[in-house]
Amino acid sequence: MTSLRTERGQEREDWTDEAFVRDWLRRQEERAPERERQFAMLCSLVPRSANDSFRYIDIASGDGSLDTVLLDRYPKAEATLLDGSPVMVKLAGERFSGTDKRVVAVQGDLETSAWLDAVKPPYDLAMSSIALHNLEDPTRLRELYAEIFDVLGEGGLFMNLDYMRAPSRALWPLYQKASRRSEGGFAMEIRSIRDYAGTADEHVGWLREAGFAPVDCFWREFRLAIVGGFKGSVKVTG
């Protein structure tokens, strides 16, 4: 979760409140089948074989749900889990505590460049899942993409799975209707969020501006998309 407190309609989200965070995580269970499918897609795009050793950072990692899946598929990977919420960092640490020395969970506020002080680049891979839409300012998001570019090593890949603005406002009700069935109550919760920072095409353009090449929208389904790009040469080993 990128910010400690965000406004969503009349609801005030407080990511420093453990009760709120645990309730939010509980509500995500309604989306378990979709989350598992999305995580599997992200993992399938990692350009590494199952036996490769590499370092990656999960940006706005939450409690580490994605990382459980990724580390199971890539057992030699080492992970940095970064989140702005101290509660999420605590829960992520507990998830892997004592059982997985490959993982470190750290706190960092993505609303400024201060998060860079909490991490130890370079990384071979950077990922984010359903989080960066909280950065509603396009300027800050473009800055963040440039910062992510800087923490990647040569040949590194960044992927962002997130909600993005519809190409046309007229399409939003249709996307909302189509996604409601798969996302259950969560779709109702965010139905008023019409102005995410950028369409998928705009995100791809911002990644290119940050230095990523090649870049692409790797996958899209209604308002969800995976956008990303490489830093330098593309090398696929798996």
Question: Where are each of the predicted segments found?
Answer:
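A short glycine-rich, Lys/Arg-flanked "PGG" loop and its adjoining helix->strand segment in the class I
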Residues: 142-154
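C-terminal alpha-helical "lid/dimerization" subdomain adjacent to the S-adenosyl-L-methionine
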Residues: 161-210, 215-217
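Core SAM-dependent methyltransferase catalytic element
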Residues: 208-238
